[in-house]
Design a protein with these regions (language model features):
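Conserved active-site/ligand-binding neighborhood in enzyme cores
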Residues: 1-215
């Protein structure tokens, strides 16, 4: 059964994103479903005594290992893990603005937004105008990024920039040319998504899941 699951970020999260140059990494505003699955897999494997055994020439995978699993409380989880569904995580009550969503060019979401396809008035002229903005001749533009699904206001993900370096463990000094910065999702926010754990008991309130890197 699919369930809506909320995640409270207890630390900054760096996941996916782009490398603007050799020393500046930027996280995406969302958390990929594959990254979330890997976080749950890591949690399971940390409790498994057979985590490094090969199955089909692969190591470190969640899989049912027959009678050796014995009375482990994760048996049903391991049996069904490959069939489970993990959606992307977005800030709670948000989604990406559809391509047909428009907002006032001058005042943004302070004025009512409109969908040019779902609009009640489908005449081309009125459909591409903000009717509350005479001072800007009613011009509208594409909405971009995340929007709150309740208020239709644009949602800005809080970010955190931190500086990191690599250590040479032989000399216990900083490696040359190893200083870099991370632009990550800031801790303290609530992210939400859909997970189908196949009624295996995987989802338990209060679990700590580690996702992303450098955080």
């Amino acid at each position: 059964m699919k369930k809506i699951v909320n995640f409270a970020l207890d630390s900054d999260v760096m996941t996916g994103g782009i490398k603007l140059n050799n020393n500046f990494l930027v996280s995406t505003d969302y958390i990929n479903g594959a990254v979330l699955r890997a976080g749950f897999a890591n949690m399971i494997l940390l409790e498994c005594p057979f985590y490094d055994e090969e199955i089909n020439n692969r190591k470190y995978i969640v899989a049912y290992r027959g009678e050796r699993c014995g009375d482990c409380n994760k048996v049903e989880v391991c049996k069904k893990f490959s069939d489970m569904y993990f959606s992307f995580l977005f800030p709670k009550d948000t989604k990406y603005s559809p391509l047909t969503m428009k907002s006032c060019k001058a005042y943004g979401t302070e004025h009512p937004v409109k969908d040019i396809i779902a609009s009640d008035n489908m005449t081309p002229k009125s459909n591409f105008m903000c009717h509350e903005c005479a001072s800007a001749n009613g011009r509208i533009e594409n909405m971009k990024g995340l929007i709150n699904v309740k208020s239709y206001k644009q949602h800005k993900v809080e970010r955190s920039i931190s500086t990191h370096t690599a250590i040479n463990y032989n000399t216990r000094t900083i490696k040359d040319s190893s200083l870099f910065q991370i632009d990550a999702i800031k801790k303290g926010q609530i992210y939400s998504g859909i997970i189908d754990d196949m009624d295996s008991g995987l989802l338990v309130e209060g679990l700590t899941i580690y996702v992303g890197k450098y955080s």
